[in-house]
Amino acid sequence: MPSDSCLLSLTVLQRLRAICPPLSTFYLFFVIFVVSTIFHCHRRLGLVPAPWASPSLVVFPPRHMPREGMFTIRVKGRLGNQMGEYATLFALARMNGRLAFIPASMHSTLAPIFRISLPVLHSDTAKRIPWQNYHLNDWMEERYRHIPGHYVRFTGYPCSWTFYHHLRPEILKEFTLHDHVREEAQAFLRGLQVNGSQPSTFVGVHVRRGDYVRVMPKVWKGVVADRGYLEKALDRFRARYSSPVFVVTSDDMAWCRKSITASRGDVAFAGNGLQGSPAKDIALLMQCNHTVITLGTFGIWAAYLTGGDTVYLANFTQPNSPFHTVFKPEAAYLPEWVGIAADLGQPNTVGSGHASARAPKRHWGALL
């Protein structure tokens, strides 16, 4: 016969079973909690599916937009343009006390190459925001220090050091190459020799041609870099440094091989000469000590990030060129850079060609 203590224990157990839910109920509540948490997190944060994507795609619920406002920028152009747009957004947001967010397409272009840090704005969120479009010229103006509006989207092709040079250390950090990109470029440079010896001075050379060959003479009344300019630029470095090697990148490598004298053994033609490999080209240029550039924002950025001495093509348009309304040389090239004047009389250039004379709808930056 059970003792009184056993009977008491059985009675307590029966009462607990009566008032406590079964274990399966606890499992059900736990599953609901986990699913709910995942659902709400998924709505707020969508991670970019890439190994370089440290920022998240930011999704703000409609009633939780940043009260201090936010800046973004409309993406236009290729790599050089987007680097200029990113740096300008970075600087103007800091200057105006706003949060800065980049479009997902800009992240897809820059993040595989550089260690950028600005967060990405989800496209679904961007569509719900009442943006105020704000056009930027390609140079800093005083009014840009006090930009009105809470939700501002910049337009234009800004790529001028006048926007962001006061933040140069931070800009250099934003455009730090990923290790694997940098190491691939360095491996190429280590394999170069000048007359059988390892060079100590590397000069990156970027030759921009492409559609500029026809657009410059017909639309902008200007020229592209010719053989004479490149000879002068390279000779300047040969006179200043002992046994330099020139690392040539271009979107028209066939023209470079015909036009740049390589008989001295100090010229290396790098890359495949296609516009589809900008990451490799800019990485090579950035690992050099000095830079020679022709036209385009790509070359300007390569020189800016490299440091060292820079030689650029100057005075490449006629005095009455409409190019002067959208481009200021003093805002594009750092004061310490050295310009070599273009030959405006080179044959089959100014006023020739087969392109339509009608001015394009795009800003010149779209061609760079």
Swiss-Prot record:
TM segment ranges: 21-41
Glycosylation site residues: 195, 289, 315
Function as written in the Swiss-Prot or TrEMBL entry: Catalyzes the transfer of alpha 1,2-linked fucose to ganglioside GM1 and galacto-N-biose.
Name of the protein this chain belongs to: Galactoside 2-alpha-L-fucosyltransferase Sec1
Chief site of localization: Golgi
Reaction equation(s) it catalyzes: a ganglioside GM1 + GDP-beta-L-fucose = a ganglioside Fuc-GM1 + GDP + H(+)
Source species, domain of life: Eukaryota
Pathway recorded for this protein: Protein modification; protein glycosylation
Catalytic EC class: transferase
Organism field: Mus musculus
